[in-house]
Amino acid sequence: MPINKYKAAVVTSEPVWENLEGGVVKTIEFINEAGKAGCKLIAFPEVWIPGYPYWMWKVNYLQSLPMLKAYRENSIAMDSSEMRRIRAAARDNQIYVSIGVSEIDHATLYLTQVLISPLGDVINHRRKIKPTHVEKLVYGDGSGDSFEPVTQTEIGRLGQLNCWENMNPFLKSLAVARGEQIHVAAWPVYPDLSKQVHPDPATNYADPASDLVTPAYAIETGTWVLAPFQRISVEGLKRHTPPGVEPETDATPYNGHARIFRPDGSLYAKPAVDFDGLMYVDIDLNESHLTKALADFAGHYMRPDLIRLLVDTRRKELVTEVGGGDNGGIQSYSTMARLGLDRPLEEEDYRQGTDAGETEKASSNGHA
């Protein structure tokens, strides 16, 4: 039975930097908190685990190497006990979980968003299709079968995009065409315009993301938009500063950027600069009726006979096998299946109460 009215939570908090176990524990704590508050959905920021590597915007190659190694060591594999513990928390709290992680698959990292159902099943696994600027030094590109933004759920057609994907007109068009009703615009951590240094464009700062890009998404798509944002402390700034470089001493410009917008683009909620925790929203999907009546770019307000979007959702792999089918064609497979995300949770294992030491047995799964 579809649920049109429900409570949701948006995370605006500091990650546990480069600490996989600490990140999992904090994630489960927030899921528990949202569950106790009666939420049907909780939305986490981009690469919440193990935090956004903001240092990559500030260091040279040699300075980056020890930081990159630590970051890779604390990224999460999809078929790991850590991920199953998060899935179990979603199941135990009967809540949808949209979470951004640094995923390690073989030897490559991806900016990944996972959508977990109240049954603990992974119902969407998507990878950012193109890391932004210096992010290309850390992460790889998503593939055809891992960029679908929208999933049909009992709480509506729920979409997810990472960071600057939220201003990509083609990805927005795809989400609109899928009939998106509620959107998670997951953001990392970066400063506001008070830290702007010429000639760096204003595009590269947090307040345009929060107060221009995110409400524009709501207006253009007619959806509820939840925009979780990471926070950072002075101690966190030190962690993102290489040895021999003077760290910043004021974290204020980096904080207070999470937002919630209604389907007409009006602001529902924003946090105080010093707020760390969960922001709550009472979603009513029926609010989008009038915005969609005015402008439905997947329906009455579009001309597909004139403008169309070509989408290729096939997996492209380095090694491609031919044969095996009735027509001897090229074999294909699902990334989700290869990663084990199509397997249900085992009832006897990976409960929230699993001893932390037990998590070691699968924590290296998929790591280089």
Curated annotation (Swiss-Prot):
Its EC number is 4.2.1.66. It catalyses: formamide = hydrogen cyanide + H2O. CDD domains: nitrilases_CHs. The gene is cht. It comes from Microdochium sorghi. Optimum pH is 7-8. Active from pH 6 to pH 8.5. Oligomer of dimers, forming left-handed helical fibers. The lineage of its organism: Eukaryota, Fungi, Dikarya, Ascomycota, Pezizomycotina. The keyword Secreted does not apply. Catalyzes the hydration of cyanide to formamide. Degradation of cyanide may be important for plant pathogenic fungi in infection of cyanogenic plants. Optimum temperature is 42-55 degrees Celsius. This is Cyanide hydratase. GO terms for biological process: cyanide catabolic process.
